[in-house]
Structures are given as C-alpha cells and as structure tokens.
Regions:
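N-terminal pre-domain segments of enzymes
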Residues: 24-40
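Solvent-exposed, charged/polar functional surfaces in cytosolic regulatory/catalytic domains
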Residues: 50, 54-57, 61, 139-146, ...
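Bacterial N-terminal signal peptides that target proteins for export
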Residues: 1-10
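Short, contiguous alpha-helical
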Residues: 45, 49-56, 68-117, 157-203
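Surface-exposed helix-capping loop/turn segments at secondary-structure junctions
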Residues: 60-69, 143-153, 190-197
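Boundary at the C-terminal end of the N-terminal hydrophobic targeting segment
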Residues: 19-23
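Acidic/histidine-rich alpha-helical segments that form the ligand environment
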Residues: 47, 120-158, 166-181
Length: 203
C-alpha cells in the first residue's frame, strides 16, 4: 500500500515537471509592433478621397435632363431662391475652387477660365462638367501628396487675390467648401425624387 502511494506520488510529480518543461519551452508571444502614425500627406489625401466620393457620386446621380435644375420655379410658399446656382453651376463652382486651392499648392494654373470661381460658362453638358470635377480631385490628390511636415504651414500665393495662405488652409478649406455645397446638392437631388447615393443604404 505504501509502495502504491509512493508510485502515485512519483507519477504525479513527473507529470507536473513535464508540464512545466513544456510551458518553459513555449516561446513568448512577441509584443505587437507599434503602428507608425500616418503622414500629413496621407491624412490630407484621405480627406480629399472622402469628399471626392460623396461629391462625384452626387453629381453623377442627377440625370442629364435635370442637371441644370434650380428650385427657383418651384414656387414654394415663403421661399426665396432668386439667384441661387443651378445643380450644374454648383458642381462647376466646387471644381473651379478645387483647381484654385490645390493649384496654389502644386503651382498648377486652372485648365480653363475660372470666371470668378464659377467655372467656364461654355461648359454645359453633364459629361464635360463631371470630367472637370474629377480632374479637379485628381489635382487634389497630387497636391495632398506633396504636403510634408516641413511645408504644411508654408505660405503660397493666395488664389483669391493678393496675399498668401498656408498649404494647410488650402487642404482644409477645399474639403470644407466641398461639403458646404454638397449639402445644397443633396437638397436638389431630393427635390427631384432622387435619394443621394450616400443615403441609399439608410433608406
């Protein structure tokens, strides 16, 4: 009986030692490598991509025959839409300001007559206006990728007249300006029974 208890104790001890040995042999899990913070260029480029997606999708959602829609003729009681831009003019205006702001960063001149920020009056077709818009965002991505920690607050000639503005202002204001007019375009779409693409998953 005494021998049986001794053998049981030895077996238990061997099992414990084996388990400890296996645990000791198992390699330690390496600590996760800290993720490098994004560059300023990457942050700005991401913001450009966000407004580009929302704005271009909204522009493409409006049918050709309604591209020059403005609410001036709706005769909504209590409303005053006199002088507001048409849908097409909203798109051209934002694209033009994009060219002005991002061109200030890259040194590129606007590809067409900016017409005081309203874009070329001769450009009237949906296809041409949407291409003009997409080209402006292509310049935006190029401008974003040129911004560094060293030059982000560096000054460039203001496209709005005399004086200078920083590259950071060009980047942030171009995005804010786009979303400002995007809100107007969303209303125009809904006035025509069109759900904005960004809202279609929520309806």
């Amino acid at each position: 009986m005494k021998h049986a208890r001794l053998f049981s104790l030895l077996a238990l001890l061997c099992s414990a030692v084996g388990a400890l040995a296996q645990g000791a042999a198992k390699p330690a899990t390496p600590a996760p490598t800290p993720q490098a913070p994004p560059t300023i260029a990457a942050v700005i480029d991401r913001e450009v991509g966000i407004i580009e997606k929302e704005f271009v999708d909204a522009a493409e959602a409006m049918p050709e025959d309604k591209f020059n829609f403005a609410p001036t003729g709706l005769n909504i009681p209590g409303s005053d839409y006199k002088g507001v831009r048409t849908f097409a003019q909203e798109v051209k205006h934002v694209a033009t300001v994009n060219f002005m702001l991002w061109g200030a960063v890259t040194g590129d001149k606007p590809p067409v007559d900016i017409n005081n920020g309203d874009g070329p009056a001769s450009m009237t077709s949906k296809a041409d206006i949407v291409k003009y818009l997409k080209d402006s965002y292509a310049l935006g991505h190029r401008a974003a990728k040129s911004v560094t920690a060293e030059n982000v607050v560096g000054l460039v000639p203001s496209p709005f007249g005399s004086g200078t503005i920083s590259r950071l202002f060009c980047a942030t204001f171009s995005v804010a300006h786009g979303f400002d007019h995007y809100g107007q375009m969303v209303e125009y779409l809904r006035m025509n029974g069109i759900i904005p693409p960004a809202s279609r998953g929520n309806n």
